[in-house]
């Protein structure tokens, strides 16, 4: 039996990335940071290579919860489809890179899971127009590349997983 991958595709270098270290200098770090109380439940990607979409959906749900103390699932399948649009692989369960997923959240946003549910058999179908209209109201404003462990730890200490 062949080993099954989860669908992560390494990011290609992109000189257009905003670097995290240009935003804030590294601060004195706490001994421990635990953000789990603000995180939504980890969801099962099942047999689909949608790990980046699952991770990014969880991250967006975290950010939403920090703003309004309410959890609502965003559509992992919507994110996964649009990641693969950028990569030109919508017809395949090809996996995707985190950068393309983040670009998707910046450009298209994410609709709610109840609008475009995680039905694996629909992974290659374009989401409905209403999904894109809803998603436009739910975009991230910016993203910044993290290049080192100290930058990652600083980011976590500032409350950004």
Where are these regions (language model features)?
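Acidic helix-start/capping segments at beta-turn-to-alpha-helix junctions
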Residues: 71-87
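N-terminal zymogen propeptides
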Residues: 1-33
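Solvent-exposed, acidic/flexible segments
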Residues: 45, 49, 72, 91-98
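Structural recognition of the beta-strand scaffold that forms the well-ordered cores
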Residues: 50-53, 78, 104, 161
């Amino acid at each position: 039996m062949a080993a099954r991958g989860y669908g992560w595709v390494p990011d290609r270098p992109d000189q257009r990335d905003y670097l995290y270290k240009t935003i804030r200098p590294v601060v004195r770090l706490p001994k421990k940071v635990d953000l789990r109380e603000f995180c939504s439940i980890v969801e099962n990607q099942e047999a689909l290579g949608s790990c980046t979409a699952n991770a990014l959906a969880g991250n967006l749900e975290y950010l939403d919860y920090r703003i309004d103390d309410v959890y609502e699932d965003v559509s992992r399948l919507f994110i996964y489809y649009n990641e693969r649009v950028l990569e030109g692989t919508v017809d395949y369960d090809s996996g995707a890179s985190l950068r393309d997923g983040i670009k998707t959240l910046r450009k298209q946003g994410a609709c709610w899971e109840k609008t475009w549910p995680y039905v694996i058999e629909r992974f290659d179908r374009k989401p409905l127009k209403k999904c894109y209209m809803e998603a436009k109201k739910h975009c991230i404003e910016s993203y910044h590349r993290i290049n080192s462990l100290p930058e990652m730890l600083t980011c976590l200490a500032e409350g950004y997983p």
